[in-house]
Amino acid sequence: MIYQHRFVIARGGRLVKRHAAFQKEALGALEEHGSVLIGAWEVWIGPEAGCSVYQIRQFESLAAWEQHRERVHRDASLNDRYRSNLSPINDFVETAIVKRVEESPQLPTVWGTVDSVRGMPRGFFEQRTLYFRPGTSAAHHRVYFEQLVPALERDGARLQTFFDTVIGPGTTNTGSHRSIELRRFPDMASWQRWREAQESDKELATLVKEVWLSKVERVESVLLYPLDYSRMR
């Protein structure tokens, strides 16, 4: 499987309008054309909070993703609706193609319908985007999965997935130096306990601040809340 990771900004109080227009004009049509929207989150804390969303779509392969794009481009009705009702709302869209790292927790390959998850309980997600110097991601991943992930599975926190970038920012001819981590928390209190433990637990603090961060060039973090049409919740 490969995944499309997308960031959409709609400033000036237009995000709610964007949610409604996306569900009405595009959500069903895009799924009919072969993509599965597995996750959609509003940014609650972080840059562009209250005016941006992250989306993840699942495809069987890069070829399937390209075929999906071609079908969408040929759909004149969808394109007309998008230009009229969605494009004027969006300020910025950034897209990358990512692939789950082998050591990462598995994601389902088959998902229920969007309507089957509406109204179901939702947790919170922290998304961290990790940047590495070219050629150093493999060394980071060894430390990350062998030491950091087990230590951070506490206070209700669970790593949901970990991606490397295949196409987009942070890629070179020889590989990826940009990864995306998604971790779920049952509630904000759980996230706060988890984060405070990285200060109060001296052994954990050393692991995070000295061992792990020595392998990372830069970290960007946002707290996300699933939209009601998000399958990941």
Predicted stretch roles:
Residues 2-17, 102-169, 174-189, 228-233:
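Surface-exposed interaction/gating patches
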Residues 16-39, 45-50, 58-101, 146-147, ...:
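An amphipathic, aromatic/His-enriched active-site/gating alpha helix that lines ligand/cofactor pockets
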